[in-house]
Structures are given as structure tokens and as C-alpha cells.
Amino acid sequence: MASNLVLGSTGVIGSGILATLLADSSISAVHTISRRAPKSTGPTLHATIEADTTQWGAKLAGIKPTPSTVYSGLGTTRQQAGGIANQWKIDHDLNVELAQAAKKAGVHSFVFISSAGSGGLLANYLPYSKMKKGVEETIKGLDFEQAIIVRPAIILAEREVPHQGAPLLIGATRALGRWFGLGLQDKLGQEGEVIARAAVHAAKIAAEGKAPSKYWVLESSDIVRLGRTEWKD
């Protein structure tokens, strides 16, 4: 895991992935491409600030040496984007474009932060799940040496701009965890830090040639196991 690239590094999961990678002394370089500077800093960080997302594919291609692993936690909300059509351009189209650019550049592993709903029966009907499913299918079709799909349920984390109704949902999920045990909470949602760590842990396992499959999907139980139970600082 000599060199890594984090897309969506200013978001709730992407920023967690970035912080985790920057704290890892075994990683020589951590690149980011974003519209604004990430909050985390460190001697191994190489941040590219580019407001024009149509240039991100070219920026990715220009990173030398080519990152061994690319993480994408890239995404927005319908409210922030100004509607489903604009959200689709980021959550689906930009992710697809960057996955294609990563494959063309020779990236070995691609890690995508998806959603639990992308694997459900309604994934073809719910707009958000449909976006994520489309990206997953593209990544699978690109045939990376290693693809890792992370499917968290409710993301238990504070956001700069809260999703509509998210604070209430997060509060209710944590309350159920207090009342009925952490096991129930783990099924309903995962802490943002745990999700980020699970993504990094899975990539490390893959780099060691120990991934269970070439196209590895992490569901809620896998996220908790890799990001908390088996995690070692």
C-alpha cells in the first residue's frame, strides 16, 4: 500500500479514510483530489484542489507513480445538489468516470463506499440505491485486480451539512443500541470511523493477497468486524 488516492476526502467517510491512511507509517503517499482542501494534514499528504470536477479524471491520470489503491467516498445529497438529476451527476456519473480513469491508469485496487440498499430488491427503483448499484456494476465490469464494495447501513456520524432527517434517525439508532444492545445498533447502522477503518483494513488484506474474492462486498457485519472487532491501531 505504498501510494493511495482518496476521492471524496472532505466527506464524512472519505475524511475518515484519509485520516486513517495519514496515520499509517507504512504508507508513503496519500493523494486527494477535491474541490476544497481536506481538514486532515500530514507529511505524506499530496492534495490536489480542483473546483472543476470534469478535470478530475485527468488529475488522477497525472499522479505518478500510479496509486496502488483508490478509495471513493464521493457523494452528495439531493438537497445539496439541488435535485436528483444533479445528485446523479456526482454520485453516479463522476464515480463511474473516475473508476474508468483509475482502471486506465493501472490502479490495482478500487474501494467504493456504497450503501446497504444497493444490494436490495428495491435497488432498481429507489434513486439513491440505483445510483450506487450502477457504480458497483461499472466497477465489477472494469475488472480491477481487486475491487472492494463497502455497503454501510445508516452512517452514524455528524456531517457538516446534515442529511434531511438524519439527526433524528441517527439518534433513534443509537438509542436502540443503548436499550437493546450494541448488536442491534450494528445491524441498523455503523459509526463513520468504523466504516472508514473497515475500508482501509480490507484494502490491506487485499494487498497481502488474502481477500476472499476479487470482487469483495462488505456488508454491515463485515464492516463491524474489520473496522472495530479486528481493527488494530
Swiss-Prot record:
Subcellular location as annotated: Mitochondrion outer membrane
* Highest rank taxon of the organism: Eukaryota
Sorted alphabetically, the Gene Ontology cellular component annotations on this record are: mitochondrial outer membrane
Pfam families the record matches: Epimerase
Give the transmembrane region(s). none
GO BP annotations listed = import into nucleus
Q: Which InterPro entries match?
A: Epimerase_deHydtase (IPR001509), NAD(P)-bd_dom_sf (IPR036291)
User: Which residues are the transit peptide here?
Assistant: 1-36
Keyword list (alphabetical) reads: Membrane, Mitochondrion, Mitochondrion outer membrane, Transit peptide
Task: Indicate how the chain sits in the lipid bilayer.
Answer: Peripheral membrane protein
Family assignment? Answer: Belongs to the FMP52 family.
Q: What is this protein called?
A: Protein FMP52, mitochondrial
